[in-house]
């Protein structure tokens, strides 16, 4: 059995997510799988010194904030959710509902490429649960469990 590699470019990502510069934290999707056995997605966030956050965090020793790693992971889960169920209607948004068991293993800085691997676990009453792992050069930098909720606006 062969598996077709599926990817998404920035325009396709912008069609799915409401986020825009400077808060769009996913540059591309390298692969995703939506099957009965698994629902996974691999996304990329390129961390650049030109990002506004580095003006104050921290100018002499820039560190990409852990909360933004989690945001990138959450945006990757949103993309996975939308590839599973389709883009929300104009009066719907998916809200980041919770983070559990977030662990930060090492700092991330300019020049690093975050690889974001997320997996859908379950959905109940409009609330979806995911796991996420962020790596740089194959080394784990962050893990977390994430939940999002679909709501009308």
From Swiss-Prot:
UniProt KW Lipid biosynthesis keyword: yes
Compartments reported by the entry: Cytoplasm
Documented EC number(s): 4.2.1.59
Family the entry assigns: Belongs to the thioester dehydratase family. FabZ subfamily.
Major localisation: cytoplasm
Domain of life assignment: Bacteria
Upper taxonomic lineage: Bacteria, Pseudomonadati, Pseudomonadota, Gammaproteobacteria, Aeromonadales
Reaction catalyzed: a (3R)-hydroxyacyl-[ACP] = a (2E)-enoyl-[ACP] + H2O
Gene Ontology MF terms: (3R)-hydroxyacyl-[acyl-carrier-protein] dehydratase activity
CDD domains named in the record: FabZ (cd01288)
Entry GO CC: cytoplasm; membrane
Protein name, entry field: 3-hydroxyacyl-[acyl-carrier-protein] dehydratase FabZ
UniProt-listed GO biological process terms: fatty acid biosynthetic process; lipid A biosynthetic process
Residues the record marks as active site: 57
Reported function: Involved in unsaturated fatty acids biosynthesis. Catalyzes the dehydration of short chain beta-hydroxyacyl-ACPs and long chain saturated and unsaturated beta-hydroxyacyl-ACPs.
Keywords assigned: Cytoplasm, Lipid A biosynthesis, Lipid biosynthesis, Lipid metabolism, Lyase
SUPFAM superfamilies registered for this protein in UniProt: Thioesterase/thiol ester dehydrase-isomerase (SSF54637)
